Curated annotation (Swiss-Prot):
Encoding gene, per UniProt annotation: tig
Keyword Nucleus assigned: no
Stated name of the protein: Trigger factor
Subcellular location field: Cytoplasm
NCBIfam families: tig
Length: 430
């Protein structure tokens, strides 16, 4: 094998790879073995015609497609390894010369990992991030717990008031016609919750059980459905029942019922401690992000478009998986958000570029600082991931993960070490 390397443009190289005729003929024979059964030549049973007859009957090029694939699969990886080329995408293969008894020559044009020029990455100055737990936040959490533990009972008499729960039947019309999703029976709605569009809920205030009313509202301009966006609608509503929420008193008895604590003060203290921990973790994450951004601002990288496009595709796949867990798909998501695949991808572009840049910088710093993942760290990370799967044989699962996802685990570990290095060497300023 002979390889010539030509720099076409920044981050793009073209390799001209020559495979000697003997090797190519071996690939043709391999192609023949793979495809022999599909050839039907008069005078021979199907799949039994010899190679020389196949070439005469179908032409010598009939076996070239697979032969080319065999040659490329064998020689391309060796060529990029020998020439220290790090591709970020599949190569564009073009045949230069091919034929019986000839050397096989092809070119492989490929986009490569860009050069990263690191600026200052130790000692970057970043503003201190800190949060305080407000008493109001603690009180709001208590109110939320109070709401969750409210007792609900039927309101035998009287009208609907703010805070009541109305059980309703409704049917909606737009342009005088019923529309999909605009009808329900025995629907529970808390008046004042803002669940329904416009002032729908406010128009139910004052109604009694078994009363009906025509409610007029307008859908928001960005409602998410083209047939409803910005359109006025009329709903026929009937009150089936009215319920009242009775909030429990915020006292020691409440604390005993909803927690492991004996007094309300102990519960408040626990809520405050949990909030402090959450805010501390939030501050830490924001500070780390600010450090990485500062390091990124000092670096110079010309990122190939293909790397950004690949990251966008990864982000779309992640979105698709998250939606799947919620019983949705991308089509439904686009309709609900009044968006499209193109709009979502464009929205993701800035984040994708930021992620790619960060990854490249982290990898370069790891190389400069000689930061690597040890075998012990890989085992620990694999075990950590395995525990999340909830399998009985955690050790076996960890072993499988360590083998199948080693590259991803290494990146995760190394990036974590690089982040620690950057944070430890940063300067926190007020």
């Amino acid at each position: 094998m002979n390889v010539k390397v030509e720099n076409i443009e920044k981050n793009v190289v073209k390799l001209e790879i020559t495979v000697d005729s003997e090797k190519f003929n071996e690939a043709v024979k391999k192609s023949f073995k793979k495809n022999a059964k599909r050839f039907n030549v008069p005078g021979f049973r199907k799949g039994k015609a010899p190679l020389n007859i196949i070439k005469k009957y179908y032409g010598e090029g009939v076996l070239f497609e697979d032969a080319i694939n065999f040659c490329c699969e064998d020689t391309y990886p060796k060529a990029i390894e020998e020439n220290n080329i790090k591709p970020v995408d599949y190569p564009q293969i073009d045949v230069v010369q091919i034929g019986e008894g000839k050397d096989f020559i092809y070119t492989a044009e490929v986009t490569t990992v860009p050069e990263v020029k690191l600026g200052e990455y130790k000692g970057v100055e970043v503003k201190k991030v800190s949060y305080e737990v407000e008493d109001e936040a603690v009180e709001n959490e208590l109110k939320s717990m109070q709401e969750k533990n409210a007792r609900v009972s039927l309101k035998e008499e009287g009208e609907i008031e703010k805070g009541n729960i109305a059980i309703i039947d409704f049917k909606g019309y737009v342009d005088g016609k019923a529309f999909e999703g605009g009808e329900a029976k025995d629907y529970e709605i808390e008046i004042g919750s803002g669940t329904f569009i416009g002032d729908f809920e406010d128009q139910l205030v004052g109604l009694k059980k078994d009363e009906s009313k025509e409610v007029n509202v307008s859908f928001p301009e960005e409602y998410g459905r083209e047939d409803l966006n910005g359109k006025p609608a009329t709903f026929e509503v009937t009150i089936k029942d009215i319920k009242v929420k009775e909030l429990p008193a915020l006292d020691d008895e409440f604390a005993k019922e909803v927690s492991e604590f004996d007094t309300l003060e102990e519960l408040k203290s626990d809520i405050k401690d949990r909030m402090k921990k959450e805010l501390s973790e939030k501050a830490k994450a924001e500070y780390e992000e600010a450090v990485v951004e500062a390091v990124g601002a000092n670096a110079e990288i010309e990122i190939p478009k293909v790397m950004i496009e690949k990251e966008i595709e990864n982000m779309v796949r992640d979105l698709e998986m998250r939606l799947k867990y919620q019983g949705l798909d991308l089509k439904s998501y686009y309709e609900f958000t009044n968006s499209s695949e193109e709009k979502v991808k464009e929205y993701m572009r800035e984040t994708a570029e930021k992620r790619v840049k960060t990854d490249l910088i982290m990898q370069e710093i790891a190389k400069v600082e000689d930061i690597k993942a040890t075998e012990e760290e890989l085992k620990e990370k694999a075990m950590e991931v395995a525990k999340q799967y909830g399998q009985k044989d955690v050790e076996k699962t960890a072993e499988l993960i360590a083998n199948a996802q080693k590259a991803y685990l290494e990146i995760d570990i190394v990036n974590g070490k690089v982040l620690d290095l950057l944070v430890e060497n940063s300067k926190e300023i007020a």
